[in-house]
C-alpha cells in the first residue's frame, strides 16, 4: 500500500482573515471546480484575500475567490471571480445558517489545500474585529516577539 502524503499541501492561505476576524469554528468542504481551474489552483494561482462565502437556496457559495485562468487553457477557461459552490452536508449547512443569521457572523474561506488529490476549502465561521482589537493583537504579537528575542540572546 502506498504511503499517505503527509506534506503540507496548502495551495493558498487567507492570512488577512486571521488579522480581520476572530475565528470561531472551521469546516472542511469540497469545492465544485470546472474546466482548467484545478490545474491553475495546483500551480498556486489562487487568491483568497477578499473572499467570503454566502448561503443561498440551501447551498454555500464562495464569492470573490480569484482563480487565475490556466495559461494553456484557451477556450476551457472560465471567469476568474465566478461564484463556486462549496460541498457540505445538509446538517453542516444548517449549522452555518444558524451562525450567519446572528449579527456580526460571516463565513470566510481561510485555506485551499489538497486532500487525497482533491481540492478542499477550510471554511471558517468568523466575527469581525474592531480596530482596537487589531491594535491589541499587534501589540501582543510584538511583545511575544521581543520575549522570544530576549530568550534567544540569553542562551
Curated annotation (Swiss-Prot):
It is found in: Cytoplasm. GO terms for molecular function: RNA binding. CDD domains: SmpB. PROSITE patterns: SSRP. It holds the Pfam family SmpB. The keyword Ribosomal protein does not apply. One of its GO terms (biological process) is trans-translation. The keyword RNA-binding applies. It comes from the Bacteria. GO terms for cellular component: cytosol. Keywords: Cytoplasm, RNA-binding. Belongs to the SmpB family. PANTHER family: SSRA-BINDING PROTEIN, TMRNA-BINDING COMPONENT OF TRANS-TRANSLATION TAGGING COMPLEX. Required for rescue of stalled ribosomes mediated by trans-translation. Binds to transfer-messenger RNA (tmRNA), required for stable association of tmRNA with ribosomes. tmRNA and SmpB together mimic tRNA shape, replacing the anticodon stem-loop with SmpB. tmRNA is encoded by the ssrA gene; the 2 termini fold to resemble tRNA(Ala) and it encodes a 'tag peptide', a short internal open reading frame. During trans-translation Ala-aminoacylated tmRNA acts like a tRNA, entering the A-site of stalled ribosomes, displacing the stalled mRNA. HAMAP family: SmpB. This is SsrA-binding protein. The gene is smpB.
Amino acid at each position: 500500500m502506498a504511503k499517505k502524503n503527509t506534506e503540507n499541501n496548502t495551495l493558498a492561505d487567507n492570512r488577512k482573515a486571521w488579522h480581520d476576524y476572530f475565528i470561531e469554528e472551521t469546516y472542511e468542504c469540497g469545492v465544485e471546480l470546472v474546466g482548467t481551474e484545478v490545474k491553475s489552483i495546483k500551480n498556486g494561482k489562487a487568491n483568497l484575500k477578499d473572499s467570503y462565502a454566502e448561503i443561498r437556496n440551501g447551498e454555500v457559495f464562495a464569492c470573490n475567490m480569484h482563480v487565475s485562468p490556466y495559461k494553456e487553457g484557451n477556450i476551457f477557461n472560465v471567469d476568474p471571480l465566478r461564484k463556486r459552490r462549496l460541498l457540505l452536508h445538509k446538517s453542516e449547512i444548517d449549522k452555518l445558517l444558524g451562525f450567519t443569521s446572528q449579527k456580526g457572523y460571516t463565513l470566510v474561506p481561510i485555506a485551499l489545500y489538497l486532500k487525497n488529490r482533491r481540492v478542499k476549502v477550510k471554511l471558517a465561521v468568523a466575527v469581525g474585529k474592531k480596530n482596537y482589537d487589531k491594535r491589541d493583537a499587534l501589540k501582543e504579537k510584538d511583545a511575544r516577539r521581543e520575549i522570544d528575542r530576549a530568550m534567544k540572546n540569553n542562551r
